[in-house]
């Protein structure tokens, strides 16, 4: 299972949604807002026949509280193989999640831009 965080036009905040089809994804979250990539990656996950858990955030990369609530909500779900947070390169959030990722042997999925932002912020 891959957990993605992202913006959407509908759906409750602070709730992890297990999604099994494209129809269910669109029915639950609607269309992605302009410049949002979370739903795009969620679609790719389903097209690659992977299980999906989607967590709606108010604004990708900026709704720190939404990310923290979401990370705590999915902390007990041990079937998650990877977590994707497009737009999120905040050092505090990444450092908080890293021990859990290592413990559960999960991957953190970055976009190239987010990885660059994270690495250059470390200097």
Residue ranges and their predicted role:
Residues 1-123:
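Surface-exposed assembly/interface segments
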């Amino acid at each position: 299972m891959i957990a993605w965080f992202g913006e959407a036009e509908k759906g409750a905040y602070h709730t992890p949604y297990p999604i099994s089809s494209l129809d269910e994804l669109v029915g639950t979250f609607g269309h992605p807002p302009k410049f949002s990539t979370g739903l795009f990656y969620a679609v790719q996950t389903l097209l690659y026949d992977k299980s999906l858990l989607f967590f709606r955030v108010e604004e990708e990369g900026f709704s720190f509280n939404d990310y923290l609530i979401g990370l705590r909500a999915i902390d007990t779900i041990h079937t998650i193989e990877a977590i994707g947070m497009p737009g999120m390169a905040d050092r505090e959030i990444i450092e908080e999640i890293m021990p859990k990722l290592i413990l559960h042997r999960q991957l953190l999925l970055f976009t190239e831009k987010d990885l660059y932002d994270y690495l250059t912020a470390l200097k």
